[in-house]
């Protein structure tokens, strides 16, 4: 398993903004800028890159068909990429042992791992539920290059 410590350290310097790339049906890349963070995968307990995506997002459709993603974070000229299998957990992508309450808490955990804070968690929870938001968890198979100081 690839180490995510350098990735986590690097992305914190840029508000946890990263580019996530998925693969369209025609084989071309689809990329989005998102907030992401490193946290333990709720099903495996191993470190993963997590992000939250609205239910209608193209990246979710791509990941359902081709569950692999690349995430790249940068700070100045330093950058780190993470590649790996992606798992979706959400109202349209159920997972064993993750009920509605566990999903609510997982989405919060990803948001806070990505540096987010909120003054009204009830509103946050309601908005994500209304948007049918899903957790995207990328288990690292490869990281490159090592961030340099």
Question: Which residues does each predicted region cover?
Answer:
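Alpha-helix boundary recognition
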Residues: 11-13, 64-65, 129
């Amino acid at each position: 398993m690839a180490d995510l410590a350098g990735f986590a350290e690097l992305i914190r310097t840029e508000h946890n903004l990263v580019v996530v790339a998925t693969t369209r049906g025609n084989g071309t890349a689809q990329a989005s800028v998102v907030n992401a963070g490193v946290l333990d995968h709720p099903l495996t307990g191993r470190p993963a890159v997590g992000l939250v995506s609205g239910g209608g997002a193209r990246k979710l459709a791509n990941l359902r068909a081709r569950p692999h993603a690349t995430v790249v974070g940068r700070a100045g000229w330093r950058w780190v990429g993470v590649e790996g299998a992606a798992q979706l957990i959400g109202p349209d992508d159920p997972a064993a042992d993750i009920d509605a309450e566990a999903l609510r808490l997982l989405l919060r955990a990803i948001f806070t791992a990505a540096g987010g804070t909120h003054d009204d968690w009830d509103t946050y929870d309601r908005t994500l539920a209304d948007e049918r938001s899903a957790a995207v968890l990328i288990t690292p198979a490869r990281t490159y290059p090592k961030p340099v100081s």
